[in-house]
Curated annotation (Swiss-Prot):
InterPro entries: Pyridox_Oxase, Pyridox_Oxase_CS, Pyridox_Oxase_N, Pyridoxamine_oxidase_dimer_C, Split_barrel_FMN-bd. Its cofactor is FMN. Keywords: Flavoprotein, FMN, Oxidoreductase, Pyridoxine biosynthesis. Substrate binds at residues 9-12, 69, 126, 130, 134, 194-196. One of its GO terms (molecular function) is pyridoxamine phosphate oxidase activity. Binds 1 FMN per subunit. It comes from the Bacteria. It catalyses: pyridoxamine 5'-phosphate + O2 + H2O = pyridoxal 5'-phosphate + H2O2 + NH4(+); pyridoxine 5'-phosphate + O2 = pyridoxal 5'-phosphate + H2O2. This is Pyridoxine/pyridoxamine 5'-phosphate oxidase. FMN binds at residues 64-69, 79-80, 86, 108, 143-144, 188, 198.
Length: 215
């Protein structure tokens, strides 16, 4: 018999998450979890894949999967076309949320905060280490705009290849990075019978406060 959606579930059986196991600030815990995800998750799961949520001018939410490309004491960095839908939304409402899910570890991390552009130098530094096809694509693709068909996109790629046939492409002004400056980070560890562990960190007056949330 075909399994119904109502019957689709799994019980989580890995270790829990206690306050004694957790540091007073969230970045150290995220680093630990991320390193474990890199070692544990297998393709097609990418440990640095996350869902980014933004809102448009009408307050309607939009979400999509991106790759985390930078992490430091300031926040979490990703790159995109500034003229894309997400870029326009962040220009109007510079706040976002991101979620990481690592199924092999039965873990999830939710992050919320203000978003700002990184410097042009930081954007260029990352752009230059991307594969050539990706660098050309940043010039060729009018991201999030309506196009006629795949042939139109292929034509734009050919034009861009011809444009940069004798030189390396440089980082376009309409493409670059954003850094999410976290104000809230929640760590979720799956537990049996849906009685999950949730440790929530909130930034209050430049200091992190830790609290446990009911599942």
């Amino acid at each position: 018999m075909t399994q119904t959606l109502a019957d689709m579930r799994r019980d989580y059986t890995r270790d829990g998450l206690t306050e004694a196991q957790s540091p007073q600030e969230p970045f150290a815990l995220f680093h630990t979890w991320f390193e474990e995800a890199v070692k544990t998750e297998q393709p097609p799961v990418e440990a640095n894949a996350m869902t980014l949520a933004t809102v448009d001018e009408e307050g309607r939410p939009h979400c999509r999967v991106l790759l985390l490309k930078g992490l430091d004491a300031q926040g979490f960095t990703f790159f995109t076309n500034y003229e894309s839908a997400k870029g326009r939304q962040l220009a109007a409402h510079p706040f976002a949320a991101m979620t990481f899910f690592w199924p092999a570890l039965e873990r999830q991390v939710r992050i919320e905060g203000r978003v700002e552009k990184v410097s042009a130098q930081e954007s260029d530094a990352y752009y230059q280490v991307r594969p050539l096809g990706s660098r050309l694509g940043a010039w060729a693709s009018p991201q999030s705009r309506v196009i006629a068909d795949r042939d139109e996109l292929e034509g734009l790629i050919r034009q861009t290849e011809q444009r940069f046939a004798d030189t390396q492409p440089h980082c376009p002004e309409h493409w670059g990075g954003y850094r999410l400056l976290p104000e809230r980070i929640e760590f979720w560890q799956g537990r049996s019978s849906r009685l999950h562990d949730r440790l929530n960190y909130r930034l209050i007056n430049a200091k992190w406060a830790r609290e446990r949330l009911a599942p």
